[in-house]
């Protein structure tokens, strides 16, 4: 192995890592793009209603919409204090 081959192989490994990271970012952006525009507002309103009865943070509620062929499921995960 020559001196130049050592540095060249490192660039290939770096390129593959960068490509993998970019694929993850693109997949995340695509999944966010499919969510409806009203989802952040819905999450805020749910937080306000629950906040009337229990003190929770915005980070304690997660709203997600899963779509299948002909069905959409709204999933709420709320971490309530003990």
From Swiss-Prot:
UniProt-listed InterPro entries: MinE, MinE_sf
A biological process term (GO) from this entry: regulation of division septum assembly
Keywords, alphabetical: Cell cycle, Cell division
Pfam families named among the record's database cross-references: MinE
Main function: Prevents the cell division inhibition by proteins MinC and MinD at internal division sites while permitting inhibition at polar sites. This ensures cell division at the proper site by restricting the formation of a division septum at the midpoint of the long axis of the cell.
HAMAP family: MinE
Similarity annotation: Belongs to the MinE family.
Name of this chain's protein: Cell division topological specificity factor
Phylogenetic placement of the source organism: Bacteria, Pseudomonadati, Pseudomonadota, Gammaproteobacteria, Oceanospirillales
């Amino acid at each position: 192995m020559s001196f130049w081959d050592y540095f060249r192989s490192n660039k290939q490994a770096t390129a593959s890592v960068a490509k993998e990271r970019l694929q993850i970012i693109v997949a995340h952006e695509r999944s966010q793009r499919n969510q409806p525009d009203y989802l952040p507002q819905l999450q805020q309103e749910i937080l306000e209603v629950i906040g009337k009865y229990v003190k929770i943070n915005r980070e304690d509620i997660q709203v997600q919409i899963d779509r299948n062929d002909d069905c959409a499921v709204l999933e709420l995960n709320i971490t309530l204090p003990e």
